[in-house]
Protein backbone atom coordinates (compact mmCIF):
# COMPACT_ATOMS: atom_id res chain seq x y z
CA UNK A 1 0.00 0.00 0.00
CA UNK A 2 1.33 3.43 -0.96
CA UNK A 3 2.24 5.85 1.83
CA UNK A 4 -0.64 8.20 2.67
CA UNK A 5 -0.03 11.53 4.40
CA UNK A 6 -3.12 12.97 6.07
CA UNK A 7 -3.07 16.78 6.37
CA UNK A 8 -6.47 16.98 8.06
CA UNK A 9 -6.92 19.68 10.68
CA UNK A 10 -8.66 17.21 12.97
CA UNK A 11 -9.34 14.41 13.48
CA UNK A 12 -5.73 14.34 12.42
CA UNK A 13 -2.99 11.92 11.50
CA UNK A 14 -1.84 9.60 14.29
CA UNK A 15 1.69 8.16 14.58
CA UNK A 16 2.05 5.01 12.48
CA UNK A 17 3.70 3.19 15.39
CA UNK A 18 0.73 3.96 17.62
CA UNK A 19 -1.78 2.71 15.07
CA UNK A 20 0.23 -0.47 14.60
CA UNK A 21 0.28 -1.18 18.33
CA UNK A 22 -3.44 -0.46 18.63
CA UNK A 23 -4.09 -2.81 15.73
CA UNK A 24 -2.06 -5.59 17.33
CA UNK A 25 -3.85 -5.16 20.66
CA UNK A 26 -7.33 -4.55 19.30
CA UNK A 27 -8.83 -7.98 20.03
CA UNK A 28 -6.53 -9.12 22.82
CA UNK A 29 -5.41 -6.25 25.02
CA UNK A 30 -3.10 -6.86 27.95
CA UNK A 31 -3.55 -10.61 27.60
CA UNK A 32 -7.21 -10.39 28.63
CA UNK A 33 -8.62 -11.81 25.41
CA UNK A 34 -10.80 -8.72 24.98
CA UNK A 35 -10.39 -5.25 23.53
CA UNK A 36 -9.47 -2.29 25.71
CA UNK A 37 -12.79 -0.86 24.50
CA UNK A 38 -14.61 -3.64 26.35
CA UNK A 39 -13.01 -3.50 29.81
CA UNK A 40 -14.43 -1.60 32.75
CA UNK A 41 -13.07 1.89 33.25
CA UNK A 42 -13.00 1.11 36.97
CA UNK A 43 -11.08 -2.14 36.59
CA UNK A 44 -7.46 -2.24 37.73
CA UNK A 45 -6.19 -2.75 34.17
CA UNK A 46 -7.74 0.45 32.83
CA UNK A 47 -6.95 2.39 36.00
CA UNK A 48 -3.31 1.64 35.23
CA UNK A 49 -3.76 3.00 31.69
CA UNK A 50 -5.31 6.17 33.07
CA UNK A 51 -2.62 6.72 35.69
CA UNK A 52 0.23 6.12 33.24
CA UNK A 53 -1.34 8.46 30.69
CA UNK A 54 -1.60 11.26 33.23
CA UNK A 55 1.95 10.70 34.47
CA UNK A 56 3.38 10.71 30.95
CA UNK A 57 1.40 13.82 30.02
CA UNK A 58 2.65 15.61 33.13
CA UNK A 59 6.21 14.59 32.32
CA UNK A 60 5.97 15.83 28.73
CA UNK A 61 4.78 19.30 29.76
CA UNK A 62 6.48 19.50 33.17
CA UNK A 63 3.10 20.15 34.77
CA UNK A 64 3.65 21.55 38.30
CA UNK A 65 2.30 19.57 41.24
CA UNK A 66 -0.25 22.27 42.13
CA UNK A 67 -2.09 21.68 38.85
CA UNK A 68 -4.73 19.03 38.25
CA UNK A 69 -5.01 17.16 34.95
CA UNK A 70 -8.53 16.18 33.91
CA UNK A 71 -9.55 13.83 31.10
CA UNK A 72 -12.95 15.04 29.93
CA UNK A 73 -15.70 14.96 27.33
CA UNK A 74 -17.01 17.87 25.29
CA UNK A 75 -14.11 19.10 23.19
CA UNK A 76 -13.00 22.70 22.94
CA UNK A 77 -16.56 23.93 22.56
CA UNK A 78 -17.47 22.26 25.83
CA UNK A 79 -14.64 24.17 27.49
CA UNK A 80 -15.89 27.45 26.00
CA UNK A 81 -18.72 27.00 28.52
CA UNK A 82 -16.78 25.18 31.24
CA UNK A 83 -14.20 27.95 31.70
CA UNK A 84 -16.65 30.73 32.66
CA UNK A 85 -18.86 28.32 34.59
CA UNK A 86 -15.88 27.20 36.70
CA UNK A 87 -13.67 30.28 36.97
CA UNK A 88 -15.94 33.34 37.11
CA UNK A 89 -16.72 32.94 40.80
CA UNK A 90 -18.62 35.99 42.02
CA UNK A 91 -17.41 38.18 39.15
CA UNK A 92 -19.47 39.01 36.09
CA UNK A 93 -16.86 39.83 33.47
CA UNK A 94 -13.82 38.24 31.86
CA UNK A 95 -11.28 39.44 29.31
CA UNK A 96 -11.32 37.74 25.91
CA UNK A 97 -8.71 38.35 23.24
CA UNK A 98 -10.04 37.87 19.72
CA UNK A 99 -7.39 36.78 17.23
CA UNK A 100 -9.42 34.46 15.00
CA UNK A 101 -12.28 32.07 14.43
CA UNK A 102 -11.97 29.93 17.56
CA UNK A 103 -11.35 32.84 19.91
CA UNK A 104 -14.51 34.44 18.51
CA UNK A 105 -16.41 31.19 19.07
CA UNK A 106 -15.29 31.14 22.70
CA UNK A 107 -16.47 34.73 23.09
CA UNK A 108 -19.89 33.90 21.65
CA UNK A 109 -20.34 31.06 24.15
CA UNK A 110 -19.04 33.11 27.09
CA UNK A 111 -21.76 35.73 26.52
CA UNK A 112 -24.26 33.21 27.90
CA UNK A 113 -22.55 33.32 31.30
CA UNK A 114 -20.82 36.68 31.66
CA UNK A 115 -20.10 40.01 30.02
CA UNK A 116 -16.88 39.51 28.07
CA UNK A 117 -14.51 42.44 27.73
CA UNK A 118 -13.37 41.77 24.17
CA UNK A 119 -10.03 43.02 22.90
CA UNK A 120 -9.66 42.70 19.13
CA UNK A 121 -6.00 41.81 18.59
CA UNK A 122 -6.28 41.35 14.83
CA UNK A 123 -4.35 43.81 12.67
CA UNK A 124 -3.14 44.10 9.09
CA UNK A 125 0.53 44.87 8.51
CA UNK A 126 1.72 45.53 4.96
CA UNK A 127 -1.31 43.70 3.64
CA UNK A 128 -0.71 40.66 5.84
CA UNK A 129 -2.84 39.42 8.73
CA UNK A 130 -1.18 39.69 12.13
CA UNK A 131 -1.84 39.87 15.88
CA UNK A 132 -0.95 42.69 18.23
CA UNK A 133 1.81 41.75 20.68
CA UNK A 134 0.74 40.89 24.22
CA UNK A 135 2.17 44.13 25.60
CA UNK A 136 -0.58 45.97 23.68
CA UNK A 137 -3.45 43.83 24.90
CA UNK A 138 -5.88 45.91 26.93
CA UNK A 139 -7.16 44.04 29.96
CA UNK A 140 -9.74 45.24 32.46
CA UNK A 141 -9.26 45.61 36.20
CA UNK A 142 -12.26 43.57 37.33
CA UNK A 143 -12.03 40.50 35.09
CA UNK A 144 -12.14 37.00 36.57
CA UNK A 145 -9.70 35.75 33.93
CA UNK A 146 -8.23 36.43 30.50
CA UNK A 147 -8.88 33.96 27.66
CA UNK A 148 -7.10 33.55 24.34
CA UNK A 149 -6.35 30.93 21.68
CA UNK A 150 -2.61 30.49 20.95
CA UNK A 151 -3.19 28.81 17.58
CA UNK A 152 -6.03 29.47 15.17
CA UNK A 153 -6.43 26.46 12.89
CA UNK A 154 -8.64 28.17 10.31
CA UNK A 155 -6.84 31.51 10.16
CA UNK A 156 -3.38 29.95 10.27
CA UNK A 157 -2.40 32.39 13.01
CA UNK A 158 -0.24 31.65 16.05
CA UNK A 159 0.52 33.57 19.24
CA UNK A 160 3.76 32.09 20.55
CA UNK A 161 4.45 34.66 23.28
CA UNK A 162 4.35 33.48 26.88
CA UNK A 163 1.76 35.38 28.96
CA UNK A 164 3.25 37.70 31.56
CA UNK A 165 0.41 39.79 32.94
CA UNK A 166 1.22 39.41 36.62
CA UNK A 167 0.19 36.96 39.31
CA UNK A 168 -3.29 38.47 39.66
CA UNK A 169 -4.33 37.67 36.08
CA UNK A 170 -5.72 34.17 35.60
CA UNK A 171 -4.91 33.14 32.04
CA UNK A 172 -7.14 30.57 30.33
CA UNK A 173 -6.05 29.25 26.94
CA UNK A 174 -7.36 26.98 24.21
CA UNK A 175 -4.33 24.88 23.27
CA UNK A 176 -6.32 22.36 21.21
CA UNK A 177 -4.19 22.66 18.08
CA UNK A 178 -0.76 23.39 19.55
CA UNK A 179 -0.55 21.33 22.75
CA UNK A 180 2.62 19.17 22.93
CA UNK A 181 4.05 20.79 19.78
CA UNK A 182 6.38 23.12 21.69
CA UNK A 183 7.44 23.66 25.30
CA UNK A 184 5.14 25.86 27.39
CA UNK A 185 5.43 27.22 30.90
CA UNK A 186 2.30 25.79 32.47
CA UNK A 187 2.80 27.92 35.58
CA UNK A 188 1.89 31.04 33.57
CA UNK A 189 -1.66 29.75 33.11
CA UNK A 190 -4.66 29.14 35.32
CA UNK A 191 -6.43 26.86 32.85
CA UNK A 192 -5.18 25.12 29.72
CA UNK A 193 -7.53 22.95 27.70
CA UNK A 194 -7.15 20.97 24.51
CA UNK A 195 -9.33 18.74 22.40
CA UNK A 196 -7.41 15.55 21.68
CA UNK A 197 -8.07 15.20 17.98
CA UNK A 198 -5.09 17.18 16.71
CA UNK A 199 -1.90 16.57 18.71
CA UNK A 200 -3.03 14.17 21.43
CA UNK A 201 -5.10 11.32 20.01
CA UNK A 202 -8.51 10.55 18.51
CA UNK A 203 -11.60 12.71 18.84
CA UNK A 204 -13.76 12.30 21.94
CA UNK A 205 -11.26 13.23 24.65
CA UNK A 206 -10.47 16.66 26.06
CA UNK A 207 -7.65 17.37 28.49
CA UNK A 208 -7.82 20.20 31.01
CA UNK A 209 -4.93 21.44 33.14
CA UNK A 210 -6.25 23.59 35.98
CA UNK A 211 -4.46 25.24 38.89
CA UNK A 212 -5.85 23.72 42.07
CA UNK A 213 -6.67 27.04 43.76
CA UNK A 214 -9.23 27.65 41.00
CA UNK A 215 -11.25 24.58 41.96
CA UNK A 216 -14.41 24.85 44.02
CA UNK A 217 -15.69 28.04 42.37
CA UNK A 218 -18.15 26.54 39.88
CA UNK A 219 -21.45 28.26 39.28
CA UNK A 220 -24.36 26.45 40.91
CA UNK A 221 -25.84 25.98 37.43
CA UNK A 222 -22.68 24.36 36.04
CA UNK A 223 -23.50 20.87 34.75
CA UNK A 224 -21.75 18.29 36.90
CA UNK A 225 -19.99 16.81 33.88
CA UNK A 226 -18.28 20.19 33.29
CA UNK A 227 -17.48 20.91 36.94
CA UNK A 228 -13.69 20.73 37.36
CA UNK A 229 -13.96 19.93 41.08
CA UNK A 230 -16.33 17.02 40.51
CA UNK A 231 -14.18 15.66 37.70
CA UNK A 232 -11.07 15.97 39.85
CA UNK A 233 -12.68 14.38 42.91
CA UNK A 234 -13.75 11.43 40.76
CA UNK A 235 -10.45 10.88 38.99
CA UNK A 236 -11.97 12.07 35.68
CA UNK A 237 -14.45 9.19 35.96
CA UNK A 238 -17.60 10.92 37.18
CA UNK A 239 -19.24 9.08 34.30
CA UNK A 240 -17.87 6.54 31.84
CA UNK A 241 -14.95 8.27 30.09
CA UNK A 242 -13.98 7.81 26.42
CA UNK A 243 -11.76 4.87 27.29
CA UNK A 244 -10.46 4.02 23.82
CA UNK A 245 -9.47 7.64 23.16
CA UNK A 246 -7.80 7.76 26.59
CA UNK A 247 -5.88 4.54 25.84
CA UNK A 248 -4.76 5.74 22.40
CA UNK A 249 -3.71 9.11 23.78
CA UNK A 250 -1.63 7.27 26.35
CA UNK A 251 0.12 5.44 23.52
CA UNK A 252 0.80 8.78 21.82
CA UNK A 253 2.36 10.12 25.03
CA UNK A 254 4.68 7.13 25.18
CA UNK A 255 5.53 7.61 21.50
CA UNK A 256 6.38 11.25 22.19
CA UNK A 257 8.62 10.35 25.13
CA UNK A 258 10.40 7.69 23.07
CA UNK A 259 11.03 10.23 20.31
CA UNK A 260 12.64 13.00 22.32
CA UNK A 261 9.63 14.58 23.97
CA UNK A 262 8.22 18.03 23.36
CA UNK A 263 11.65 19.62 22.85
CA UNK A 264 12.35 17.33 19.91
CA UNK A 265 8.86 17.87 18.48
CA UNK A 266 9.52 21.60 18.66
CA UNK A 267 12.64 21.23 16.50
CA UNK A 268 10.98 18.97 13.94
CA UNK A 269 7.88 21.16 13.74
CA UNK A 270 10.07 24.16 13.04
CA UNK A 271 11.81 22.28 10.23
CA UNK A 272 8.50 21.22 8.71
CA UNK A 273 7.08 24.73 8.83
CA UNK A 274 10.20 26.32 7.36
CA UNK A 275 10.18 23.83 4.49
CA UNK A 276 6.54 24.45 3.59
CA UNK A 277 6.55 28.21 4.04
CA UNK A 278 9.80 28.35 2.10
CA UNK A 279 8.17 26.87 -1.00
CA UNK A 280 5.22 29.24 -0.65
CA UNK A 281 7.38 32.34 -0.15
CA UNK A 282 9.69 31.53 -3.06
CA UNK A 283 6.79 31.25 -5.46
CA UNK A 284 4.41 33.60 -7.24
CA UNK A 285 2.06 30.67 -7.72
CA UNK A 286 1.27 30.12 -4.02
CA UNK A 287 0.49 32.69 -1.35
CA UNK A 288 0.08 32.83 2.42
CA UNK A 289 -1.29 36.11 3.79
CA UNK A 290 -0.17 35.84 7.44
CA UNK A 291 2.71 37.97 8.76
CA UNK A 292 5.76 35.82 9.48
CA UNK A 293 5.74 36.65 13.20
CA UNK A 294 2.26 35.13 13.55
CA UNK A 295 2.40 32.20 11.15
CA UNK A 296 1.15 28.93 12.57
CA UNK A 297 3.53 25.99 12.54
CA UNK A 298 0.59 23.61 12.87
CA UNK A 299 -1.86 24.86 10.24
CA UNK A 300 -0.60 26.39 7.00
CA UNK A 301 -3.29 27.90 4.77
CA UNK A 302 -2.31 28.91 1.26
CA UNK A 303 -3.98 30.01 -1.93
CA UNK A 304 -3.17 29.34 -5.55
CA UNK A 305 -2.67 32.35 -7.80
CA UNK A 306 -5.47 30.99 -10.00
CA UNK A 307 -8.32 29.61 -7.90
CA UNK A 308 -9.65 27.86 -11.00
CA UNK A 309 -6.87 25.33 -10.41
CA UNK A 310 -7.98 24.50 -6.86
CA UNK A 311 -10.06 21.50 -7.87
CA UNK A 312 -7.27 20.04 -9.99
CA UNK A 313 -4.73 20.61 -7.20
CA UNK A 314 -6.90 18.70 -4.74
CA UNK A 315 -7.56 15.86 -7.17
CA UNK A 316 -3.92 15.40 -8.12
CA UNK A 317 -2.60 15.77 -4.57
CA UNK A 318 -5.08 13.17 -3.32
CA UNK A 319 -3.99 10.79 -6.08
CA UNK A 320 -0.40 11.36 -4.94
CA UNK A 321 -1.26 10.25 -1.39
CA UNK A 322 -1.54 13.77 0.02
CA UNK A 323 -4.97 13.85 1.64
CA UNK A 324 -7.25 16.46 3.26
CA UNK A 325 -5.62 19.59 1.83
CA UNK A 326 -8.85 21.46 1.13
CA UNK A 327 -9.02 24.74 3.03
CA UNK A 328 -11.75 25.50 5.54
CA UNK A 329 -15.01 26.69 4.00
CA UNK A 330 -14.61 30.07 5.72
CA UNK A 331 -11.35 30.94 3.92
CA UNK A 332 -11.17 28.53 0.97
CA UNK A 333 -7.94 27.65 -0.80
CA UNK A 334 -5.72 24.98 0.73
CA UNK A 335 -4.62 24.12 4.23
CA UNK A 336 -1.91 21.74 5.36
CA UNK A 337 -2.12 20.74 9.01
CA UNK A 338 1.26 19.42 10.07
CA UNK A 339 0.89 18.30 13.66
CA UNK A 340 3.38 16.17 15.59
CA UNK A 341 2.39 12.92 13.87
CA UNK A 342 3.11 14.34 10.41
CA UNK A 343 6.68 13.26 9.60
CA UNK A 344 9.15 15.52 7.85
CA UNK A 345 8.97 13.20 4.85
CA UNK A 346 5.25 13.97 4.55
CA UNK A 347 5.91 17.69 4.28
CA UNK A 348 8.73 16.98 1.83
CA UNK A 349 6.31 14.96 -0.31
CA UNK A 350 3.85 17.86 -0.25
CA UNK A 351 6.43 20.48 -1.19
CA UNK A 352 7.78 18.29 -4.00
CA UNK A 353 4.24 17.97 -5.34
CA UNK A 354 3.66 21.72 -5.06
CA UNK A 355 6.84 22.52 -6.99
CA UNK A 356 5.93 20.05 -9.73
CA UNK A 357 2.32 21.27 -9.90
CA UNK A 358 3.54 24.83 -10.32
CA UNK A 359 5.95 23.73 -13.05
CA UNK A 360 3.11 22.19 -15.03
CA UNK A 361 0.41 24.78 -14.39
CA UNK A 362 2.19 27.99 -13.47
From Swiss-Prot:
GO terms for molecular function: O-phospho-L-serine:2-oxoglutarate aminotransferase activity; protein homodimerization activity; pyridoxal phosphate binding. This is Phosphoserine aminotransferase. The modification N6-(pyridoxal phosphate)lysine is found at residue 198. It comes from Escherichia coli (strain K12). It catalyses: O-phospho-L-serine + 2-oxoglutarate = 3-phosphooxypyruvate + L-glutamate; 4-(phosphooxy)-L-threonine + 2-oxoglutarate = (R)-3-hydroxy-2-oxo-4-phosphooxybutanoate + L-glutamate. Pyridoxal 5'-phosphate binds at residues 76-77, 102, 153, 174, 197, 239-240. Disulfide bonds: none annotated. The lineage of its organism: Bacteria, Pseudomonadati, Pseudomonadota, Gammaproteobacteria, Enterobacterales. GO terms for cellular component: cytoplasm; cytosol. InterPro entries: Aminotrans_V_dom, Aminotrans_V_PyrdxlP_BS, Pser_aminoTfrase, PyrdxlP-dep_Trfase, PyrdxlP-dep_Trfase_major, PyrdxlP-dep_Trfase_small.
Amino acid sequence: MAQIFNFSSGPAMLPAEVLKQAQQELRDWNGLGTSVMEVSHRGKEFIQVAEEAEKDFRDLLNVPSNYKVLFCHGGGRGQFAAVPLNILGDKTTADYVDAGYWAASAIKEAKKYCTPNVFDAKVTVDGLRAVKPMREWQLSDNAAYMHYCPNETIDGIAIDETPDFGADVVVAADFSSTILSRPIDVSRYGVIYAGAQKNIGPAGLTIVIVREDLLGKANIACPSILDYSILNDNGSMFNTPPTFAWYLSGLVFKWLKANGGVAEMDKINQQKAELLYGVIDNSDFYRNDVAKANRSRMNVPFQLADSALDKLFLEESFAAGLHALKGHRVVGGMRASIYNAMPLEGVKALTDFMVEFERRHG
